[in-house]
């Protein structure tokens, strides 16, 4: 007897509450997840058909039908009762109990087995590695009630050690597991950054049946390189220093920056580069140490990067490009302050400056006696001479300075000390 039902009715029936079925066999079938578009209630993968049997879960039994890859619209009746022996191979089935039907598909693993073989590295470059497997694990499928095929994920795993950048700095090793639904002739993965072995294991069905296939390559020595870098800049909190911007890598010279780099195992050559252009055509400094500190004393834009290469130079990598901007110099002097008048308010004479790399200031009274000398523009004069506040009146400063942009300053002027009468 042949069951001829149009697909629309089948799809509707598949959505009804079913009486359900269960499968048994000498080797336990593995139930797999199905896509809703398949219209199936269940799907199983079996290890052959030895002892393969379907049972209806309701006491009344069921009428049983079989269908093929064309779909369930042309199913053929194969028996009636509480249980039935299923056919060898991959087929779809219907368990019909009154107007309720349960649709399920059985895929025979032996039709597309995962065969044993050897695993080896076929080729590798700076970004990828190809593995050759002499065995096979082809695509597996099941079919829905309208004949459409759906891929079964065999969950074949490839395990190896990788390096990952750490937030604390440097690289850490961890085991990486990639999963494949089936195997092609060549397995392509990212080029490893550390010595490792590759282990292929699977598939999920052999694993469930406690006889997984497993093969491992010999040790692989990496040629690919990667790097991870960091830059930190000196943060000065001088109230009289003008910054060039809110960016921590922009500011007033001299600006001290510390550069730190970590490179992976295959790196044989490492270098920090400082250039005046983003394309690094004009490299003004090269430093082969992974960690170094540099003080930017000249005005302008500077670009910094780290590079690493393997022993033969076939693989090279570059870190992030950092931009340091040093603003043009500025220097101006106040002409009055009031030391001792109100503590913490206008009680120190300081220049206002930006990007001053050389500084010398001398302060005199009207008789030419030197009262104070300053060699750091962030420092100031507190209005004291030999520990005592000087009297109100006019005093004089002489300044010689040089900016990061090469500009020279020769300044002189008066300083008026103001103090309210008490």
Question: Which residues fall in each region the model found?
Answer:
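Bacterial Sec-dependent N-terminal signal peptides
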Residues: 1-25
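Short, solvent-exposed loop/linker segments at the N-terminal edge
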Residues: 32-49, 120-135, 139-144, 247-255, ...
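Acidic, Ser/Thr
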Residues: 54-59, 132-153, 249-255, 259-266, ...
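Short, compositionally biased serine/threonine- and acidic-rich segments at solvent-exposed termini, linkers
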Residues: 180-335, 354
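Short loop/turn motifs at secondary-structure boundaries
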Residues: 248, 253-260, 266, 297-299, ...
């Amino acid at each position: 007897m042949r069951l001829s039902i149009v697909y629309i009715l089948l799809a509707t029936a598949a959505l009804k509450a079913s009486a359900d079925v269960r499968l048994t066999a000498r080797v336990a079938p593995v139930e797999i997840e199905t896509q809703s578009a398949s219209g199936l209630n269940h799907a199983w993968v079996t290890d052959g058909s030895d002892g393969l049997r379907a049972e209806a879960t309701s006491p009344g039994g069921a009428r049983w039908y079989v269908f093929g890859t064309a779909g369930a619209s042309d199913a053929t009746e194969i028996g009636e009762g509480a249980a039935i022996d299923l056919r060898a191979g991959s087929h779809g089935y219907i368990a019909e109990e009154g107007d309720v039907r349960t649709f399920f598909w059985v895929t025979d693993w032996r039709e597309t087995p995962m065969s044993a073989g050897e695993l080896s590295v076929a080729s590798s470059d700076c970004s990828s590695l190809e593995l050759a497997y002499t065995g096979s694990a082809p695509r597996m499928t099941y079919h829905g009630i309208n004949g459409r095929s759906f891929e079964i994920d065999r969950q074949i795993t490839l395990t190896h050690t990788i390096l990952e950048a750490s937030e604390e700095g440097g690289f850490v090793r961890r085991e990486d597991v990639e999963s494949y639904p089936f195997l092609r002739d060549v397995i392509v993965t990212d080029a490893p950054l550390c010595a490792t072995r590759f282990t292929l294991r699977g598939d999920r069905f052999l694993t469930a049946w406690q006889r997984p296939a497993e093969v491992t390559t010999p040790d692989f020595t990496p040629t690919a390189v990667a790097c991870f870098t960091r830059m930190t800049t000196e943060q000065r909190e001088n109230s009289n220093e003008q910054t060039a911007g809110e960016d921590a890598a922009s500011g007033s010279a001299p600006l001290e920056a510390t550069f730190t780099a970590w490179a992976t195992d295959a790196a044989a050559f490492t270098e920090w580069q400082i250039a005046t252009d983003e394309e690094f055509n004009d490299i003004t400094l090269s430093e082969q140490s992974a960690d170094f500190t540099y003080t930017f004393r000249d005005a302008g834009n500077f670009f910094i990067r780290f590079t690493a290469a393997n022993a033969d130079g076939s693989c090279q990598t570059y870190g992030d490009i950092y931009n340091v901007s040093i603003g043009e110099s500025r220097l101006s002097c106040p002409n009055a302050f009031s030391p001792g008048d109100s503590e913490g308010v206008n009680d120190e004479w300081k220049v206002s400056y930006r990007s001053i790399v050389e500084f010398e200031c001398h302060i005199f009274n009207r008789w030419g006696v030197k009262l104070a000398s300053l060699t750091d523009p962030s420092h100031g004069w507190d209005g004291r001479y030999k520990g005592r506040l000087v009297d109100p009146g006019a005093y004089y400063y002489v300044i010689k300075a040089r900016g990061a942009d090469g500009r020279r300053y020769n300044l002189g002027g008066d300083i008026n000390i103001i103090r309210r009468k008490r």
